[in-house]
Amino acid sequence: MAINIIVAGPRGRMGYEAVQMITKEDSFRLVACLDHKHDGLNLGELEQFSDDLQVPIYTDIDSCLKQHQADVFVDLTTPEVGYKHTKTALEYKVRPVVGTTGFTDEQLSELKELSKQQQRGCIIAPNFAIGAVLMMKFSKMAAKYFPNVEIIEKHHDQKLDAPSGTAKKTAELIQDVRESQKQGHPKEEETLPGARGADMDGMRIHSMRLPGLVAHQEVIFGGAGQTLTISHDSMNRASFMDGIRECVNQVMDLEELVYGLENLL
């Protein structure tokens, strides 16, 4: 039986790729889309999509969820609306799969509680690329032996949040095995504010935003006489589709919120 899916943000770069992937999967059925405009139109009426995509577009999430019996709500929007979408989907007992980052700890706690109350799975993944998830796992392994580490994340210049959710998640995983410590010279001084990057438990995180980039990260470890670099590069957004496909399938069997694709692999 096909899984009925709603996609929020279909005209974005990630959303467009997700629509293409979902409509090619025999076990998935795209029943509706949520967008901030084009209410009442079908996807096929928009220039970037195939004419035969007769999938209705809504601008109001309540109307969308009331009109369609969806199993999964895939949100690929922005932090400003992603939290509201996720919360509303759970209230309608629809399982969210969320690629939007930038949620606060308080928002995540609220969504975890709501997911349990509704007995509906929810997956929030800072990164859907399988390679990026492995990079985070390998970084956690390396941090046991190399506690001095800095993270450099590079993204396209339209990304709104910094540092990226992937960088923060990587740092959180490293925190699990690394004692808090200040890195660098104890008397170091920034002659330009922010030159040393963001400080997370003594680790430094540096964010780059440039046109031409998609999603890239290096985790650089330093030790006596050696360095170790673990890196991942997404060359295009097709790299995220295997992760989204996996999440859509697995969220159907969950009854609580899972944060991070690494917890499903």
Curated annotation (Swiss-Prot):
GO cellular component labels: cytosol
Q: Which UniProt keywords apply?
A: Amino-acid biosynthesis, Cytoplasm, Diaminopimelate biosynthesis, Lysine biosynthesis, NAD, NADP, Oxidoreductase
Enzyme nomenclature, EC number: 1.17.1.8
Q: Where is the composition biased (Basic and acidic residues)?
A: 178-190
Instruction: Give compartment(s).
Output: Cytoplasm
Pathway per the UniProt entry:
Amino-acid biosynthesis; L-lysine biosynthesis via DAP pathway; (S)-tetrahydrodipicolinate from L-aspartate: step 4/4
Entry's Gene Ontology BP terms: diaminopimelate biosynthetic process; lysine biosynthetic process via diaminopimelate
Q: Which SUPFAM superfamilies match?
A: Glyceraldehyde-3-phosphate dehydrogenase-like, C-terminal domain, NAD(P)-binding Rossmann-fold domains
So which residues are the signal peptide here? none
- InterPro entries named among the record's database cross-references: DapB_C (IPR022663), DapB_N (IPR000846), DapB_N_CS (IPR022664), DHDPR_bac (IPR023940), NAD(P)-bd_dom_sf (IPR036291)
One short Pfam name that applies is DapB_C
> Does the entry feature the keyword Amino-acid biosynthesis, yes or no?
yes
Q: Which residues bind NAD(+)?
A: G9, P10, R11, G12, R13, M14, G99, T100, T101, A125, P126, N127, F128
Q: What class of enzyme is it?
A: oxidoreductase
Q: Which GO terms describe its molecular function?
A: 4-hydroxy-tetrahydrodipicolinate reductase; NAD binding; NADP binding; oxidoreductase activity, acting on CH or CH2 groups, NAD or NADP as acceptor
Organism's domain of life? Bacteria
The active site consists of: H155, K159
Q: Mind telling me which PANTHER family this protein's record contains?
A: 4-HYDROXY-TETRAHYDRODIPICOLINATE REDUCTASE 1, CHLOROPLASTIC-RELATED, DIHYDRODIPICOLINATE REDUCTASE
What does the record give as the function of this protein? Catalyzes the conversion of 4-hydroxy-tetrahydrodipicolinate (HTPA) to tetrahydrodipicolinate.
Family indicated by similarity: Belongs to the DapB family.
Q: In its UniProt entry, what is this protein called?
A: 4-hydroxy-tetrahydrodipicolinate reductase
Q: Which organism is it from?
A: Oceanobacillus iheyensis (strain DSM 14371 / CIP 107618 / JCM 11309 / KCTC 3954 / HTE831)
Q: What is the lineage of its organism?
A: Bacteria, Bacillati, Bacillota, Bacilli, Bacillales
